[in-house]
């Protein structure tokens, strides 16, 4: 829900004969609760979900569920499209799962989750402080302890989630992941996006995508993060 950015593209896709399913994932909203059941992911957070509690790697379960749904409905030529963090999840899913049911994909404005870049950015000291706080909570046996951070985005995070997204491992660095994507992929970026997390993509996105089979890059003039 609340996928207004997709309304106009969806209408054009429908007009071109492509069916569209607008969906969400476990990272929607800040915090919400789910019955735990037998889910390992829900047991980990005691049923709490949302952006404050999510682990990005779990996006594989969400993409698999929606792709399974589409296949069960009879679709065989499936494309997926994610925006912002959803774009990071799209690239990560394609790079790590290699699901042959997905014929093509679009990733719009994926922020770069690069630990060193966050330390070196203008607000690097704020990031360093939040990261130290998350590490302290984790070391104290409180991975679900909450912290309010302003870098790279103003939000509430559990220590586990903050370390997962922005840790030294750079697990979700979209630029690091791109060479592992085998699916034809279009990456887009708004020409008016000025956040430091998009600087390297704006600078080298065209070259990087040209080196990938089926890769393409589009810098949209005059577009902000929500196009």
Model-found features: residue ranges?
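Short beta-strand immediately N-terminal to the catalytic nucleophile in serine-hydrolase-like folds
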Residues: 80-82, 108
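Alpha/beta-hydrolase active-site loop
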Residues: 38-73
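Active-site signature of alpha/beta-hydrolase-fold catalytic machinery across serine-
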Residues: 8, 92-96
């Amino acid at each position: 829900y609340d996928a207004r950015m997709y309304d106009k593209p969806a209408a054009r896709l429908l007009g071109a004969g492509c069916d569209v399913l607008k969906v969400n994932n476990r990272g929607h909203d800040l915090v919400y609760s789910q019955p735990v059941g037998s889910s390992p992911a829900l047991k980990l957070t005691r049923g709490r979900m949302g952006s404050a509690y999510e682990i990005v790697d779990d996006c594989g379960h969400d993409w698999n569920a929606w792709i399974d749904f589409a296949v069960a409905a009879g679709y065989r030529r499936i494309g997926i499209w994610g925006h912002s963090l959803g774009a990071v999840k799209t690239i990560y899913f394609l790079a790590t799962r290699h699901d042959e049911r997905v014929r093509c994909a679009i990733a719009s404005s994926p922020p770069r989750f690069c630990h060193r870049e966050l330390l070196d950015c203008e607000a690097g000291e704020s990031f360093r402080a939040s990261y130290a706080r998350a590490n302290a909570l984790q070391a104290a046996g409180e991975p679900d302890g909450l912290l309010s951070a302003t870098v790279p985005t103003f939000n509430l995070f559990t220590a586990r989630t903050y370390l997962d997204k922005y840790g030294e491992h750079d697990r979700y660095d979209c630029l690091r992941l791109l060479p592992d994507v085998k699916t034809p992929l279009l990456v887009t970026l708004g020409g008016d996006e000025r956040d430091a997390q998009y600087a390297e993509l704006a600078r080298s996105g065209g070259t990087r995508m040209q080196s990938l089979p089926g890769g393409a890059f589009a810098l949209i003039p005059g577009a902000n993060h929500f196009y």
